[in-house]
Design a protein with these regions (language model features):
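Aromatic/acidic, Gly/Pro-rich catalytic loop(s) in extracytoplasmic/lumenal soluble domains
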Residues: 490-557
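Hydrophobic/aromatic-rich transmembrane helices and adjacent perimembrane loops
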Residues: 147-148, 154-157, 206, 309, ...
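Transmembrane-helix signature of polytopic, membrane-embedded enzymes
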Residues: 13-14, 117-140, 324, 328-332
Length: 557
């Protein structure tokens, strides 16, 4: 393929990837008449896990400014590697204390992964067409778009691993070049990417297995050419990977209890029959691609397969084509990354835990697409010699088949747009899955008068956060910028449980926001503040209990 055409197509693919990952990622701060419209922000609200990341990022900004630096691990919410939160902290410096600042980092990694899969596929298969097809299929993948728009650290894993593998195969394919300077640079870069991957997601820890095929090829090449320093390049790669992973490794040595997180709690080894559970989980994860996807509204349209049915066909054909062509890395990658999913026993099928399977799935899909269309076009091309008088007709048929291929790729994007923006994003279940009114409550508190005491009441006893606060408060804490104790006092905001309502002081004025169990909470509050009125804020559509009516609220006794 012409290099200029290839570059132009790659640019179109990256623009497409950017559209699907960035469009409508900004947040609409108010809603109309208490009902969610087609949201200006997709996803709406902020999931507690995202908010916890944001609160840690806010905390990290403070330590960064005081010169204490960033943490490599955050123990809240079962523990998370710190790189993503630290990058989100840098994003907050640019975009402020917003949900966009948290999610734009995911979008950026999602876009970079599209570039990485193009580079890797081109290097591994040595086929420009297959590489471009892999790029456009990933750019328009509902599965990948979903996690490119949520502020979860796991989105980094596909990028770091794909980019790291690209670097090794790039080096291997150019060992005979006259100059090795650029190969040293790529080895350094690839090693850093591979090492940083350990900061992305716990499932990444199995990734070293994927280095074995290419390291073996490099070893064989080095044995043949003993006078060269071929072995130096993978040595540089591995050394840089080791250096990049050292801070996290040292943390785990000092804090071994954090190494497994909650893995042991959800492991199949806690089940009565682990082997049976493992087999069932493998079946569910494979089935997720074809007929029964993730049932969590946060990750998917419940039950919708992770692959659109034509892409599922391409994937199946491509998987066997990869084996036929001895592309052993692809089945190894899929097998290795299905293991972390299969040994867990919670919420399967689980598209988030399977996130590192995404690149090889779409490489297979690209292989299958190219094999099907190139074979059919090739067959008609061969007929030109047999039926010379039908040459024009046969060329028209070939062009039509090629056009059909383009239509299928465009349709994949249209299907994702329809599924994500028109079917999934507008559902009230999605708003509920992303915290419902929690983020709006935080924005309301942030903009409320500081001189009035504001009480947020919850009856939740869920204390996942090591600070002892329920996780459902995290979106409120993030949006109101009150995760740290000092801002709470300055802004006159108090977070209490139902058992602590006797601490409420509402002699002159106050605002009380019950975030769950509305009727029991109001009943208990009436005993303390008899004249309390239930009001709805005009701008936010939130229910707020007030002792007296105020402008901007519609109240009832």
């Amino acid at each position: 393929m012409n290099k200029k055409l290839s570059f132009a197509l790659l640019l179109i693919i990256l623009v497409t990837a950017s559209f699907f990952r960035v469009w409508r990622l900004d947040y609409q701060q108010t809603r109309t008449q208490g009902a969610w419209p087609t949201p200006a922000s997709t996803p709406p609200g902020l999931f507690p896990d995202e908010a916890m990341n944001g609160n840690n990022a806010h905390e990290a900004l403070g330590t960064f400014r005081t010169g204490e630096g960033f943490r490599v691990f955050y123990r809240e919410n079962f523990g998370r590697e710190g790189l993503f939160m630290n990058l989100q902290a840098m994003s907050m410096l640019v975009f402020g204390h917003t949900s966009f600042a948290l999610r734009i980092m995911s979008a950026l990694f999602g876009i970079l992964t599209v570039l990485a899969i193009y580079l890797f596929t081109r290097e591994y298969t040595k086929n420009e067409y297959t590489a471009l097809i892999a790029g456009i299929l990933l750019a328009t993948s509902f599965w990948h778009v979903m996690f490119s728009r949520i502020g979860f650290r796991a989105i980094m894993a596909p990028f770091f691993l794909t980019a790291a593998l690209w670097a090794l195969y790039y080096v291997y394919n150019r060992l005979d070049s006259a100059s090795h300077t650029h190969l040293v640079i790529i080895s350094v870069l690839g090693g850093i990417f591979f090492g940083l991957g350990f900061y992305s997601y716990i499932a990444y820890r199995i990734a070293p297995l994927l280095l074995l095929p290419i390291l073996y090829l490099l070893y064989k090449k080095a044995k043949k050419e003993k006078d060269s320093c071929i072995i130096c390049l993978p040595a540089i790669y591995l050394f840089l990977a080791f250096l990049a992973a050292i801070p996290l490794g040292l943390y785990f040595v000092q804090n071994p209890q954090d190494f497994f997180g909650r893995t042991s709690q959800i492991s199949i080894f806690a089940q009565p029959n682990p082997l049976k559970s493992f087999a069932e989980n493998v079946g569910k994860t494979v089935g997720m691609l074809y007929y029964a996807g993730d049932f969590n509204w946060r990750h998917n349209i419940p039950g919708m397969p992770s692959l659109w049915w034509p892409v599922a066909i391409f994937f199946t054909v491509g998987f066997f084509d990869a084996i036929r062509k001895k592309y052993w890395l692809i089945p190894l990658w899929l097998t290795a990354m299905i293991l972390p999913v299969a040994i867990s026993s919670e919420g399967l099928p689980h598209s988030l835990r399977a996130i590192i399977m995404i690149p090889p799935v779409y490489v297979c899909a690209a292989l299958g697409f190219y094999l099907i269309f190139s074979s059919v076009i090739g067959w008609f091309k061969k007929q030109e010699k047999r039926f010379a008088d039908l040459e024009i007709l046969l060329k028209v048929i070939q062009a039509s088949i090629g056009t059909l291929g383009v239509v299928v790729l465009i349709s994949a994007g249209a299907n994702t747009y329809n599924s994500y923006f028109l079917r999934w994003a507008i559902r009230p279940e999605v708003a509920s899955a992303y915290g419902g009114d929690s983020y709006l409550t935080g924005l309301f508190l942030k903009n409320a008068p500081r001189d009035i005491p504001k009480y947020v009441i919850t009856s939740s006893v869920d204390s996942i956060d090591v600070t002892g606060r329920p996780m459902e408060l995290e979106p409120i804490l993030y949006a109101s910028e009150t995760y740290l104790p000092d801002p709470q006092g300055v802004k006159n905001i108090f977070y209490i449980t139902l058992k602590q309502i006797n601490t409420i002081e509402c002699k002159k004025d106050c605002m009380i926001i019950p975030i769950d169990n509305l009727q029991p909470t109001l009943g208990a509050l009436k005993k303390i503040v008899p004249d309390l009125k239930l009001c709805r804020a005009d701008d936010y559509g939130l229910l707020v209990a007030l002792p007296t009516a105020r402008p901007g609220f519609k109240c009832s006794s």
